[in-house]
């Protein structure tokens, strides 16, 4: 199809109307709970160090500038929102565009809408309850099931992801017809992620949402490590009808630990032949100033709309995905 022929939106207008109504209801949900809506930049002078995320980069050069400035499209508003929390904002949320220079397909578009919110003095479980409330209100679904990462692996793969040795993990991969990766892949977390995607995800959250919590500590990202079990992180994800909807943390507030994790990311990037990323010093400074104990979560709006209208592809709920942008 020529570019001129696909000028129309890929989503039916009826779905776009439902999308607008959903966004209105989400805003009302947070207004009723006294959570402040904020607006942070789509471009930043620093980006994420996460080896699994690829960013869009551009350069800014004003006539008055002697040197251009590198800017990155944000993959999430997390760092900016935590700077607001450290400045005393109280509970906050944001719905905005984020960008990832990665895959495109049924559930992915390089530009997407993310709902992210933070609750000072909430632990992970209290925030999970609030996410559950939102999903029930927006999707008219049943209350969610909760299942630890360990329980999910034991139930569906019959292995303990926290104690399984390399042989057990590779045997599980063979049972899932993933044998082709066993000889080349050495990273334990990559193995576990592949096993989760192939052997757990297809079987959870079919009739109601499910929260998977307490991911391995090595997959903590920006979450705190559990004080009750050092092997796991205070992190959760939400799945419903085969779709990953949300990713939440009881947030890491220790600036030194966060600095170490960023540096470890960069060492891993170097080992994988990926470019090193500069560490967001403003974010680290905010943590040093003092981030209140809090939990936060990011939820994909486009995927939420998909579930609401029973769509099979993001293109059915986005006016102009990248193919028509």
From Swiss-Prot:
Chain residues that bind substrate: 76-78, 118, 251
Gene Ontology cellular component list: cytosol
Keywords from the named record: ATP-binding, Ligase, Nucleotide-binding
Its EC number(s): 6.3.2.-
Superkingdom of the source species: Bacteria
Reactions performed catalytically: D-beta-lysine + L-lysyl-[protein] + ATP = N(6)-((3R)-3,6-diaminohexanoyl)-L-lysyl-[protein] + AMP + diphosphate + H(+)
Binding, ATP: 100-102, 109, 244-245, 300
Claim: ATP-binding is one of the keywords in the record: yes
PROSITE patterns: AA_TRNA_LIGASE_II
A single GO BP: lysyl-tRNA aminoacylation
Quaternary state and interactors: Homodimer.
Cited function: With EpmB is involved in the beta-lysylation step of the post-translational modification of translation elongation factor P (EF-P). Catalyzes the ATP-dependent activation of (R)-beta-lysine produced by EpmB, forming a lysyl-adenylate, from which the beta-lysyl moiety is then transferred to the epsilon-amino group of a conserved specific lysine residue in EF-P.
Entries under NCBIfam families matching the protein: genX, PRK09350.1
Protein name: Elongation factor P--(R)-beta-lysine ligase
Native source species: Hamiltonella defensa subsp. Acyrthosiphon pisum (strain 5AT)
Gene designation: epmA
């Amino acid at each position: 199809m020529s570019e001129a022929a696909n000028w129309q939106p890929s989503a039916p207008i009826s779905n776009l109307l439902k999308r607008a109504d959903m966004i209105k209801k989400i805003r009302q949900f947070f207004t009723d709970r006294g959570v402040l809506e904020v607006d942070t930049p789509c471009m930043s002078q620093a980006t994420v160090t996460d080896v699994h995320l690829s960013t869009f980069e551009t350069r800014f050069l004003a006539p008055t500038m002697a040197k251009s400035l590198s800017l990155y499209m944000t993959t999430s508003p997390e760092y900016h929102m935590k700077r607001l929390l450290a400045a005393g904002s109280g509970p906050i949320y944001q719905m905005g565009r984020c960008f990832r220079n990665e895959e495109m397909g049924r559930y992915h578009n390089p530009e997407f809408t993310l709902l992210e919110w933070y609750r000072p003095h909430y632990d992970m479980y209290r925030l999970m309850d609030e996410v559950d409330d939102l999903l029930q209100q927006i999707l008219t679904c049943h209350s969610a099931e909760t299942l630890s990462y360990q329980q999910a692996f034991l139930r569906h793969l019959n292995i303990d992801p926290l104690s399984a040795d390399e042989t057990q993990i590779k045997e599980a991969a063979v049972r899932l017809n993933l044998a082709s990766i066993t000889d080349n892949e050495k990273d334990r977390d990559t193995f576990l992620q592949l096993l989760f995607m192939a052997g757990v995800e297809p079987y959870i959250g079919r009739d109601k949402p499910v929260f998977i919590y307490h991911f391995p500590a090595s997959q903590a990202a920006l979450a705190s490590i559990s004080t009750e079990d050092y092997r796991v992180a205070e992190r959760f994800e939400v799945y419903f009808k085969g779709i990953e909807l949300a990713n939440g943390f009881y947030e890491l507030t220790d600036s030194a630990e966060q600095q170490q994790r960023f540096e470890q990311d960069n060492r891993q990037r170097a080992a994988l032949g990926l470019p090193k990323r500069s560490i967001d010093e403003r974010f680290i400074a905010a943590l040093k100033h003092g981030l209140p104990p809090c939990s936060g979560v990011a939820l994909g709006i486009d995927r939420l709309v998909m579930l609401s209208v029973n769509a099979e592809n993001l293109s059915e709920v986005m006016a102009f995905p990248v193919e028509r942008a």
